[in-house]
UniProtKB/Swiss-Prot annotation:
NCBIfam families in the cross-refs: infC
Gene Ontology molecular function, alphabetical: ribosome binding; translation initiation factor activity
Compartments where found: Cytoplasm
Record flagged with keyword Protein biosynthesis: yes
Disulfide bond positions: none
Source organism, top-level taxon: Bacteria
Function (record text): IF-3 binds to the 30S ribosomal subunit and shifts the equilibrium between 70S ribosomes and their 50S and 30S subunits in favor of the free subunits, thus enhancing the availability of 30S subunits on which protein synthesis initiation begins.
Gene3D superfamilies for this protein: Translation initiation factor 3 (IF-3), C-terminal domain, Translation initiation factor 3 (IF-3), N-terminal domain
Swiss-Prot/TrEMBL keywords: Cytoplasm, Initiation factor, Protein biosynthesis
Protein name: Translation initiation factor IF-3
Organism of provenance: Caldanaerobacter subterraneus subsp. tengcongensis (strain DSM 15242 / JCM 11007 / NBRC 100824 / MB4) (Thermoanaerobacter tengcongensis)
Cellular component, GO annotation: cytosol; membrane
Quaternary context: Monomer.
GO biological process: ribosome disassembly
Length: 180
């Protein structure tokens, strides 16, 4: 009699497979999803060997634990494919920072505004920071007005996610792109 043993590498989910299942009794489900019944783990493992499949504990917290007959390598491959597919669907949002001083000139303000519009059109968030140096920190109201003006100019491209607030010697505001 030839016994086929599968070399199984456990991935980060820590599934218990084949001989690793130490429970006295398990509820066994076959590869089609039909319940075979409650039996000892050794009997379930023998059935798995006869069918050239793996015995995988899928619900360890149940009483008795639920085990399923399956090709574990194929199952892991399908899981990794699903994870990759989910990663592809995720949208990565970057936060771009624009720094200004409280006494910025109009032309410089326009240049910063154009770059913020470009970032918002690309789908990135924009963090607008005004850095205070020396005595400038006494005039926070000027910086707040400047940030409100900046937000007003960007109204059609994005919404203010975080209102202007002081953070140490900086005043900052976050603008998120509008959803289409």
């Amino acid at each position: 009699m030839i016994i086929f043993r599968r070399c199984v590498f456990i991935n980060h989910r820590d599934f218990q497979v084949n001989e690793q299942i130490r429970d006295k009794e398990v509820r066994l489900i076959d590869q089609d999803g039909k319940q075979i019944g409650i039996m000892s783990a050794k009997e379930a493992y023998k059935i798995a060997q006869e069918r050239h499949l793996d015995l995988v504990k899928i619900v360890p917290n149940a009483n008795p634990p639920v085990c399923k007959l399956m090709d574990f390598g194929k199952y892991r491959y399908e899981l990794s494919k699903r994870e990759k597919e989910a990663k592809k669907k995720q949208k990565i949002i970057n936060v771009k920072e624009i720094r200004m001083s409280p006494n910025i000139e109009d032309h410089d303000f326009g240049v910063k505004l154009k770059s913020a519009i470009k970032f918002l059109k690309d789908g990135d968030k924009v963090k607008v920071t005004i850095r205070f140096r020396g005595r400038e920190a006494a005039h926070t109201s000027l910086a707040e007005d400047l940030l409100k003006r900046f937000a007003e100019e960007l109204r059609e491209y994005g919404n203010v996610e975080k209102a202007p607030s002081m953070d140490g010697r900086n005043m900052m505001m976050v603008i998120a792109p509008k959803k289409q």
